[in-house]
Each structure stands twice: as C-alpha cells, then as structure tokens.
Amino acid sequence: MHFHLPKPLHGWRAFTGEVGIIVLGVLIALGFGQIVELWQWHQNVATARQEMANELAGAADQGAERVAIEACLRDRIGELVAKLNASNGRWTADAMPSPPGANHSMARVYGAPLRGWSTDSWDTAKSTGVLDHMQHQEVAAYSAAFGEIAAIRDFQNEELPLESKLSFLGAEQQLDNSSRIGALEALGQLDTLNATISGLSDLLINQVQNLHLRVDRSSSAKGLQAMIDQQREFRGRCVKDVQVQF
C-alpha cells in the first residue's frame, strides 16, 4: 500500500517559506520576551541597590553615633563602678537627665541610644531573587555589611534589659551587698557591649564606605551632625566628632 503525502496548495517551496516565517516569528517573540525579562531584572536590581544604599547609609550614621559616644558610656560605667565599690551601704541617687523624647516613668542611670538597625532592604533582595542577578563580589560586600548591622542590633537588644536592671540606682536607698554585686555584674556586661558595638560600628562604617554608595551625601552628613549635636547637648564634651565619607 502506498501513501501519498498531501501537497501544499502553493507548492513545497512556498510552504517551507511560510514555516520559516512562523519559526522566525516565534524566535523573535521568544527573544523579545527574554529582552523584556532582562530589562525588568535590570530595573529590579537598580531599585534594590538604591534601597540597600539608603539603608546602609542610615546604618553607617547610626554606627558613627555609637563611635562618637563610646567614651561617654565608658566613663559613665566607670563612675558607677567606682561609686558602688566605695558604697558602705548607703546609696545616693545618681540618675541621668532624661534624653529628648524620653517617656520612662523611672529615672535611668545609664542609657545608650536606641536605634532601628534595619535590614529590610537586604531581606527583600534575598527573598525576591534580585541577588541572583548581581555580581558575586557585590553581593558578598552587601552581605558582610548587613551582617554587621544584624549583629549590632542583637547586641543593642542585650543592652536594654541591663539598663533597666540598673534603674533602681536612680533612687536614694540602703544598698545591700547582693544588689551592689548585681549592679556591678550588669555594668561589666554593659562595658563589654559598649566596646563591642563601637568596634562593630567602626567596622560597618569602613565596609559601607568601601561600597561607594550613591546617596545624598549632603543630607546624610547633615543628619549625622544633627545626631552628634543632640548627643553632645545631652552627654557633654565627651562626645567626639565622627564623619562618614561615602
């Protein structure tokens, strides 16, 4: 039995040409789709890069603030330790003035600034797949910087309960030995945390500066200076000037 293939209406040459046109059209459509997808990822990367730059610039300023007040916090710890060691059972209230915007009902005897240390832009970049479309070295640099931010935030969270634990020293009282030892232990931990956070902040500043971020340098410098001025008004001349060069 013989089978005869149906012949195209206009011949095989015309049919082949029509098929070629269809295939070419499909390839063009696929290529255009890939171009659109690449362009979209390019836009997503640019947006993510700017969001991370803005967040890192803010974190670097917060780090500079911690470096600026490191000596103030260290001196305050030393004052309280010396007073506790010299205590003969009677404690004289030694509260700090309330910082701007404070809403505590109890006086504080020690206080570091509470900052956000946000990593939202980095978390978003990881979850959306944007990092897969960036160079490995750049991603590694961002990862290191945001890792420092997360570490500083964790250490800051350790400071808060220790600060609260010392609030009782803001009132005059008869101080028993157990309370005195407990306060000294808390101050020892705060001393370590202060040095650690300041060291990590200094490292963060260097990492951020090496990224050569595209940010509003003038606005960032003004914001940092405002923070330092506020700290100096609150803590005095122990606050040193620190700059971040983007």
Language-model regions: role of each:
Residues 18-32:
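Hydrophobic membrane-insertion alpha-helices, especially the h-region
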Residues 1-13, 37-246:
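Long, hydrophobic alpha-helical segments that serve as membrane-spanning/inserting helices
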